[in-house]
Amino acid sequence: MSRYWSDIVRQLEPYVPGEQPALAHPVKLNTNENPYPPSPRALDAIRRELGDTGEALRRYPDPVARRLRETVAAYHGIAPEQVFAGNGSDEVLAHAFQALLQHDRPLRFPDITYSFYPTYARLYRVAYETVPLADDFSIVVDDYLDDAGCVLFPNPNAPTGRALPLADIERIVAANPSSVVVIDEAYVDFGAESAVSLIARYPNLLVVHTVSKARSLAGMRVGFAFGDAALIDALTRVKDSFNSYPLDRLAQVATQASYEDEAWFQATRKQVIASRERLVGALAALGFDVVPSAANFVFARPRSHDAATLAAQLKQREIFVRHFKLPRIDQHLRITVGSDAECDALVAALRELLAA
């Protein structure tokens, strides 16, 4: 702490990102990255943009990512004016906190959810309330039907992996016409229904996507928001008051090419889903209680061992999973669905540790 810090910095509790181990060959199952490489078309697009000399890199990128937004809009069957592009979905969410979620009534989100939400709320001084999940970690829809303030939650939820059906999401959006409802769909491609189809009917709905998970582009930092043009304009006003050029040239062309390669997207998405079900079965056989998952990770509780101890023991073997020292979930592990070889290495290590 320094005497030069502002009051708000003194009060912050920063988000703690997942560990990025500096090892040659870790089994990295702690940050929900895709185990498969990006679309070959994305790699080709990067090479074309660079050319032989990298001449393009001396020029600023398109500040509004027009071609990318047009491609993504066409993919979802909406207008480009209904698409916002930002530097990762975390930045998109940050802009939403500033542009849309600061009101007299508190913002509401689940008590067990993406831990960046309370961090952003404190940073931007947004009053908030947490709404308890049910005992099975599902969102209780009736708790959000009172039009009592803005609503934010991931679907599927993180770190639990549980998803609400689209009909329940529509109930929440319809019941809150006076406030913005933000659905964070970082993991939607692995088993949930997207709410993008609802934005034409609900001007209060904002849906956030990322290319970090299903499209294997976490290193490019690209995220989107979809919603009524007035909501998108609000995000753009914040963006242009903060950073007019959030997406570099390589990120724009790689992401556009990724959306143009549907065959690759579907093949890798289905492989992750198949590997997830395989991992769920293996963990259950080892005595874990596994929460039903519609994401690219599983949330599991070892019945006979301490979760934090297991995570530490796995780390000693260069296998990384995520443990949260938080109420209600401190005996759970969040495990990314890796390649089958990575999942097999995890299961083999757990089998040895649980038998010791």
From Swiss-Prot:
Keyword check for Cytoplasm: no
Metabolic or biological pathway, per its Swiss-Prot or TrEMBL entry: Amino-acid biosynthesis; L-histidine biosynthesis; L-histidine from 5-phospho-alpha-D-ribose 1-diphosphate: step 7/9
Xref: PROSITE patterns: AA_TRANSFER_CLASS_2
Enzyme class: transferase
The protein's required cofactors: pyridoxal 5'-phosphate
GO molecular function, one term: pyridoxal phosphate binding
BP terms from Gene Ontology: L-histidine biosynthetic process
UniProt catalytic activity: L-histidinol phosphate + 2-oxoglutarate = 3-(imidazol-4-yl)-2-oxopropyl phosphate + L-glutamate
Family matches, as InterPro entries: Aminotrans_II_pyridoxalP_BS, Aminotransferase_I/II_large, HisP_aminotrans, PyrdxlP-dep_Trfase, PyrdxlP-dep_Trfase_major, PyrdxlP-dep_Trfase_small
Gene3D superfamilies: Aspartate Aminotransferase, domain 1, Type I PLP-dependent aspartate aminotransferase-like (Major domain)
E.C. no: 2.6.1.9
Keyword entries, A-Z: Amino-acid biosynthesis, Aminotransferase, Histidine biosynthesis, Pyridoxal phosphate, Transferase
Modified residues (N6-(pyridoxal phosphate)lysine): 213
Subunit note: Homodimer.
HAMAP family: HisC_aminotrans_2
Protein family: Belongs to the class-II pyridoxal-phosphate-dependent aminotransferase family. Histidinol-phosphate aminotransferase subfamily.
Protein name: Histidinol-phosphate aminotransferase 1
Provenance organism: Burkholderia pseudomallei (strain K96243)
Gene that specifies this protein: hisC1
